[in-house]
Each structure stands twice: as C-alpha cells, then as structure tokens.
C-alpha cells in the first residue's frame, strides 16, 4: 500500500467522497468532447422514446376515444448526479463504464390517469420491434418499503446518426397522477435536513401511499363500471358517434 492509499483509508468517509468527486469531475472535463457527444446521443434517444409515446397517445385518442396519457416528462441526468451515483456504486470512471453501468442517464416519465393504462402503455411500447426490454421493476405490484409505486423499465432503442447507428438505453417510469403526486412530495421531504419525529413522518407517508393506491384502484373500477353500463346505442346514436370520430383531433 502506498502513502496515498494510507491517507485515503485514514481520512473521514465524507472527505474521501469529496476527493473522489473532485477526481471524477477532473476526468470528466478531460473527456469533455467525448462526454458532450455521449450526452447528445442520449438526448436523441429520449426523443425517440418520447415520439413513440406520442404516437401511442394519438392512436388511443382515435381508436378508443380516450387518451391514457396525462403528461410526458423527460430529463437527462446531470453531471453531478452521474458522479455521485458512480461514487456511491463504486464504479471506476470511464466513458465505457458510464454507458454500460449507468442505465438512467436518459429518463422519460409518463403520467397516466389509471393503473391499467400503465400496463397497456408498457406492453404497447415493449412489443415494438425496435425496442429491447433490458430490465423491468414493478413497484406497483411490489411497492418499495417506503410506499413508492411506479413501473420502471430500462429499454434499449436504436438511434440513427449521420455516420452510425447506436443502441442506447433509456429509463422509462410510468405511473398514475396520484402516484406522481405522492412521489413528488416524498422526494421534497426526503431532502429536508432536519425532520422532527422522522420515524412518524415516514410511517405517515407510507400510510398515505397505501390510501392513494386504494383510491387509484377505486377510480379505475368506477371507470370500468361506467364503460360497462352504457345503454345500448340506437342507430342514430351509432351514426352520430361515427361522425364524431371523424372529427377527432389527430394532433
């Protein structure tokens, strides 16, 4: 063991992480051109997946007269978040490791109205010929200990550039409006430095998550009952409905 290794072992963990972060940042700057090109590729992969969801949204409007998507959010992981994650996971810094081991550099979040919309959209996306499902984590059927619910997918999508084609991974999160509301508030509270009676707050948040999950299921069941209880349409009703379908906004 050399003198530098001994110093690293003896220094406090926080200081060691700070030094590692500084070293990672320096290495990132040294590969700035390559790194910027990599971020560009991941940004383009986000566009590819976002377009797929927008196409599905348009199809559902026309085919089923109901839009399952409330909103679509996208994000490219910040450089500081990448450094923090690689240090936390003990991943040595390199462009190769960044591509191979950080699966959520590109992210897209789809907010739905109902729980069954989540699975319908996930199936529609992953059944497409050019989409490869890399990983699936169902936190709806198997919530996290804190109560978090969402469907997480890691997909690989081909992106065509002027001189090459690249397979790029994108993290897709699909959740209901209610799940997103809970996750947003929980995220804010998690980053508060001083939380009095923290254990009680954590228990309350989990209880709220369970209440929200029950409401989600009730709202979905109400919608299904309403769809099933529609009166048998007359010939005039059918004619009017067909005319309305012709006027459905495409874009």
Residue ranges and their predicted role:
Residues 2-46, 53-59, 171-251:
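An acidic, glycine-/histidine-flanked metal-binding catalytic module
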Residues 1-2, 160:
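Gly/lys/ser-thr-rich phosphate-binding loops in alpha/beta enzymes
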Residues 36-82, 87-97, 104:
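Active-site acidic/histidine clusters and adjacent loop/turn architecture
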Residues 43-61, 139, 143-151, 157, ...:
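Short, charge-rich amphipathic segments
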Residues 105-111:
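Terminal, regulation- and interaction-focused segments at domain boundaries
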Residues 15, 19, 69-72, 98-99, ...:
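Glycine-rich, low-complexity intrinsically disordered segments
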Residues 99, 112-221:
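Long beta-strand-rich cores associated with HINT superfamily self-processing modules
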Residues 75-86, 112-117, 151-158, 220, ...:
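Short, charged low-complexity intrinsically disordered segments located at boundaries
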């Amino acid at each position: 063991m050399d003198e530098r290794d001994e110093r690293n072992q003896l220094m406090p963990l926080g200081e060691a992480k700070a030094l590692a972060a500084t070293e990672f940042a320096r290495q990132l700057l040294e590969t700035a051109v390559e790194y910027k090109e990599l971020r560009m590729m991941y940004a383009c992969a986000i566009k590819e997946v976002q377009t797929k969801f927008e196409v599905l949204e348009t199809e559902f409007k026309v085919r089923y007269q109901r839009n399952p998507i409330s909103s679509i959010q996208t994000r490219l992981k910040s450089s500081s978040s990448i450094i923090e994650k690689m240090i936390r996971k003990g991943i040595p810094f390199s462009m190769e490791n960044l591509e191979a081991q950080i699966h959520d550099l590109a992210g897209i979040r789809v907010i739905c109205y109902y729980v069954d919309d989540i699975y319908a959209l996930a199936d529609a996306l992953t059944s497409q010929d050019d989409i490869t499902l890399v990983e699936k984590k169902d936190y709806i059927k198997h919530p996290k200990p804190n109560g978090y619910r969402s469907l997480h997918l890691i997909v690989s999508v081909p992106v065509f550039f002027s001189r090459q084609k690249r397979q790029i991974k994108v993290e897709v999160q699909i959740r209901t409006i209610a799940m997103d509301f809970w996750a947003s508030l929980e995220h804010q509270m998690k980053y508060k430095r001083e939380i009095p009676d923290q254990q009680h707050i954590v228990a309350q948040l989990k209880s709220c998550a369970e209440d929200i999950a029950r409401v989600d299921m009730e709202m979905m069941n109400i919608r299904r009952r309403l769809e099933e209880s529609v009166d048998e349409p007359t010939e005039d009703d059918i004619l009017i409905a067909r005319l309305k379908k012709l006027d459905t906004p495409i874009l």
